[in-house]
Amino acid sequence: MRLAVNIDHIATLRNARNEGHPDPVEAAILAEQSGAAGIVCHLREDRRHIKDDDLERLREAIDTKLDLEMAMTSEMQSIALRVKPELVTLVPEKREELTTEGGFAIHTHFKRLTEFIKPLRDHGVEVSIFIEPEDDAIELAAEAGANLVELHTGPYSLATGDKQIAYELERIRTAARIAREAGLAVVAGHGLSVHNIAPFRELHDIEEVSIGHALIARAVLVGLPVAIQELLDHISR
């Protein structure tokens, strides 16, 4: 299982003083050197953490895979077509939220989504959709032309008690299997950390986990290479 590192909160820390450091690009390079298989960043409409210049520099600097999380807007589509990350992950976005709160409502936006994905695919950009681990969302993602789905693991990360944890884990396991059967690659993310990631070693249909906040929070205390190695130790099969 691969680890993709979300560097948004390196930018959050930098923006607290607007003095240019810590640099998200420097962090991305260090993450790659420490074993990350990809770098994730979310260019929000309000630019609350990652800025346009960060994205441009990341595109030039990293050697693995750049995953651009973004809303389904014409502005973001234009940016993605210009920058051409290896992967775009479409996420729902609300200005008032602290972080992405749930999966993309594909059934509500299916026609627009299909039209949005096509030019990205035509220009060599793979497309993932951040969804709840539900059968209908997976089927619609495949029909819309996505290459991948990222399963929302927030409910799992917030689950308490063995019964609820097992229930949420089984939802993810089943969704991952259905997605693979539909021809989609599978990523999982949101709220994952060294404290809850170990069971994912047994979810063989999931190829990659995307982790940001917990990893960066740990890195503040022990350093980014150590924080990444701790996670890699927990997900190695």
Curated annotation (Swiss-Prot):
Q: What is its main location?
A: cytoplasm
Q: Where does 3-amino-2-oxopropyl phosphate bind?
A: 6, 17, 191, 212-213
Pathway participation:
Cofactor biosynthesis; pyridoxine 5'-phosphate biosynthesis; pyridoxine 5'-phosphate from D-erythrose 4-phosphate: step 5/5
User: Listed GO cellular component terms?
Assistant: cytosol
Q: Which GO terms describe its molecular function?
A: pyridoxine 5'-phosphate synthase activity
Keywords of this entry: Cytoplasm, Pyridoxine biosynthesis, Transferase
Please indicate which residues carry the site annotation Transition state stabilizer: 150
> Binding of 1-deoxy-D-xylulose 5-phosphate: at which residues?
8-9, 44, 49, 99
Which InterPro entries does the UniProt record give? Aldolase_TIM, PyrdxlP_synth_PdxJ, Pyridoxine-5'_phos_synth
Q: Name one Pfam family in it.
A: PdxJ
Q: What is its EC number?
A: 2.6.99.2
Q: Where is the active site?
A: 42 (proton acceptor), 69 (proton acceptor), 190 (proton donor)
- What GO terms in the biological process aspect are recorded for it? pyridoxine biosynthetic process
Reaction catalyzed: 3-amino-2-oxopropyl phosphate + 1-deoxy-D-xylulose 5-phosphate = pyridoxine 5'-phosphate + phosphate + 2 H2O + H(+)
Its localization reads: Cytoplasm
What is known about its subunit structure? Answer: Homooctamer; tetramer of dimers.
- Function per UniProt: Catalyzes the complicated ring closure reaction between the two acyclic compounds 1-deoxy-D-xylulose-5-phosphate (DXP) and 3-amino-2-oxopropyl phosphate (1-amino-acetone-3-phosphate or AAP) to form pyridoxine 5'-phosphate (PNP) and inorganic phosphate.
- Family, per entry: Belongs to the PNP synthase family.
Q: What protein is this chain from?
A: Pyridoxine 5'-phosphate synthase
Q: Which organism is it from?
A: Chlorobaculum parvum (strain DSM 263 / NCIMB 8327) (Chlorobium vibrioforme subsp. thiosulfatophilum)
The record lists the lineage as: Bacteria, Pseudomonadati, Chlorobiota, Chlorobiia, Chlorobiales
